[in-house]
Regions:
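SAM-dependent transferase fold signal centered on methyltransferase-like domains
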Residues: 1-266
Length: 266
C-alpha cells in the first residue's frame, strides 16, 4: 500500500505477561531460594506491604522491583516488620518507590469513599469492610424505625472507615460522637470526616475526641444521646460496653453493634 511506503518496519517480540511476581525474578535466583520467597502480601492504597524471611532479605530490592512491575498501581513497596507501640501500628521499612516518594500516607477507597490512612500511624483493616457495610444497613433500618435522623457514636474510630458511608449518607445522621485514643489516628480522622461530609446539604453536629471513651460518661453533654453505638474493640468489647451504656438514648429504640473475641473457656 502506497500509504506505508518510506516507513520503517520494526518486528517486536511479544513478551508473555507474568502470572506471578516471582516470574520476574532471575530464574537461577528464584530456584536457589524457592522455598523462602513470600507467598502473600497486602496492598493498602498504593503501598504494597510484604513480610520477608531472613533468607531473602538481602534480595529485597529484587523482590520490590518485581512487585512494582507486576502491580502498576503500586507506588511504594515496604518490608513488614510487625507491629509496635501502644497502638499496635505497622512497623514498615520502605524498600523502593516508583517515583521516589517514600511517604506511607496513602488513600484507600471503601464504600465509594476515599479514606486517608497511614498504616505506620493508625490501625486499619480491610477485612472488616463487610462488618462496616452491615453498620450502614443497620443505621438505615434504625432511622426508618425512629422516623428521623439518628445519633451515632464510634469511640474506637481509628481513621474513620466505619463512619465513611454512615455519616456521608444524606439525612441519615444529625449528631455524631467520634474518637480514638491514638492522636495520630484522630488527626487523620478529622481530615476524613471533613471529606465525608463536604457534599452534604444538611448539617451534622460532630464531636471529635482524642480520649479514653470510658471517660465520656463523665461529660454531661454526651449522656443519653446515642441511638447507634459502634464498638470495634474485639479484645475489650465486653469490658467496655458497661462504661459506654450511659451514652445511649433512653426511652427510644437504640442499637449497639460490636465484635468480641472470647476464649472458649470463658
Amino acid at each position: 500500500d502506497d500509504i506505508w511506503q518510506g516507513l520503517k518496519f520494526v518486528e517486536l517480540n511479544r513478551r508473555k505477561a507474568a502470572k506471578r511476581w516471582t516470574d520476574l525474578l532471575e530464574a537461577g535466583l528464584y530456584q536457589r531460594l524457592e522455598e523462602f520467597w513470600p507467598q502473600a502480601y497486602e496492598i493498602i492504597g498504593d503501598i504494597l506491604i510484604v513480610k520477608l524471611e531472613d533468607e531473602v532479605v538481602s534480595h529485597q530490592r529484587e523482590i520490590a522491583v518485581a512487585m512494582l512491575e507486576k502491580h502498576p498501581s503500586v507506588r511504594l513497596v515496604c518490608a513488614d516488620n510487625g507491629v509496635h507501640g501502644e497502638f499496635r501500628v505497622r512497623n514498615l521499612t520502605p524498600i523502593i518507590s516508583r517515583d521516589g516518594d517514600i511517604s506511607t500516607l496513602t488513600k484507600i477507597r471503601e464504600g465509594g469513599k476515599l479514606i486517608l490512612i497511614d498504616p505506620t500511624k493508625a490501625y486499619y483493616s480491610a477485612r472488616l469492610s463487610n462488618e462496616r457495610l452491615g453498620n450502614l444497613t443497620s443505621a438505615k433500618k434504625l432511622a426508618k424505625i425512629l422516623d428521623r435522623p439518628i445519633s451515632v457514636c464510634d469511640p474506637y474510630a481509628g481513621v474513620g472507615p466505619a463512619m465513611a458511608s454512615i455519616i456521608s449518607s444524606p439525612n441519615l445522621v444529625d449528631y455524631a460522637l467520634i474518637g480514638d485514643l491514638n492522636p495520630d489516628a484522630v488527626s487523620l480522622l478529622e481530615q476524613n470526616i471533613t471529606n465525608f461530609t463536604r457534599k452534604l446539604d444538611t448539617k451534622i453536629v460532630i464531636k471529635l475526641l482524642c480520649q479514653d471513651a470510658r471517660l465520656w460518661k463523665k461529660t454531661h453533654d454526651y449522656l443519653a444521646k446515642i441511638d447507634l453505638l459502634l464498638v470495634n474493640l474485639p479484645h475489650d468489647t465486653v469490658n467496655h460496653i458497661p462504661e459506654l451504656l450511659p451514652l445511649m438514648s433512653k426511652n427510644t429504640r437504640s442499637l449497639i453493634r460490636g465484635w468480641a473475641i472470647i476464649n472458649r473457656d470463658q
